[in-house]
Amino acid sequence: MGSCQAGHYLHFCLAHHPPLVCATLILLLLGLSGLGLGGFLLTHRTDLRSPDIPQDWVSFLRSFGQLTLCPVNGTVTGKGRGSHIVGLLTTLNFGDGPDRNKTQTFQAQVQGSRMGLKGSFARELVLVTARVTTERTPGTCLYFSAIPEILPSSQPPIPCSEEGAGNATLSPRMSEECVGVWSHEGLVLTKLLTSEELTLCGSRLLVLGFFLILFCGLCCLTAACFHPRRESHWSRTRL
């Protein structure tokens, strides 16, 4: 009896207020999705990327334009005088080449004028180093060696250790072994959400999901209370 009455209410609302029913169903689905996603974030500590990337790092990478990284000779030495080294993780992928089984080092030197810098900074050099290791880790660490005034002031989204960064001479190998990368396509920054951010996000999604489901329940209860009662068979016969 209750299921028939609920079906009658739903049929009546669909016939007379279809936009209201569709909006309620959409809110109900959003609430259920919020509960599911919030519970997943609180129970599973997965690595999720954050869209909040420091803009000075985005502008710094875009200023390189097309970057050509070439293999280097020998071991990488220490950094130059007055230089500062910053390493960060990017989505740059060098693929599976013939030398993929050994650690490779690629470098490029970029002058400040090419990056759009003016004045005395235009003559400064920025050394970009990429170390491709044999470990199957996502992304590649890039190291930037330059004076502190040129490098971004904020912390890298995902920093890398300074191991493997510094100065070296470009190898006189064939130019085909160099890797050309457009900075606005290949050097995409990655930043993972911390455990505190995951907890905050999951709890807010749970609260939002509960609120939406409660709101949908109140809407259904209001519609059931103000719905005109169906006349019984005996009352129609009496009339």
Swiss-Prot record:
The UniProt record lists the keyword Glycoprotein: yes
Membrane-spanning intervals of the chain: 206-226
Main location: membrane
First and last residue of the signal peptide: 1-38
Membrane topology: Single-pass membrane protein
Glycosylation sites: 101, 167
Positions in the Extracellular compartment: 39-205
Task of the protein: Cell death receptor specific for IGFBP3, may mediate caspase-8-dependent apoptosis upon ligand binding.
Protein name: Insulin-like growth factor-binding protein 3 receptor
Gene for this chain: TMEM219
